[in-house]
Amino acid sequence: MHVFVDRQQEMETLQSEYERNGSALVVLYGRRRVGKTTLISEFIRDKNALFFLASEESEAQNRAAFKEKAAEFIDSELLRNADVKSWDVIFKAIVDAKYDSKPVIVLDEFQYLGKAEPAFPSIFQRIWEEILKKQSVMVILCGSLISMMESQTL
């Protein structure tokens, strides 16, 4: 039996954002070890979701890892084998794929992407405005370095 306790309000908020018409962007941040990733994992358990855990590696290494996750998510050998130098191409491939239900894209430890490439928050803002916002997709940005998350996302 699967048990998930004391996060009903947060789950309802995420579900409400998911059910909105069009796109939704959710920023979830807080101290380490308070259950943010567990909350997200529970929320996406029955959804069509791509979960990416960023690392403290370089921007290029994170982009390559995200490309692999995206290629697996949309089942695209073309994307998997492509030499992708831009985050835009990966996000465009994700939203251009066909889905039975609204896809959810989770970028966990988002602050590491901004740490590896200081321009990443503005790059992501452009991707949101030009690609993601115009589609029916939910994006969750999650992080634990509170000051960095606030400066990068709010």
Go through each PLM region and give its residues.
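Phosphate-binding site recognition
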Residues: M1-L154
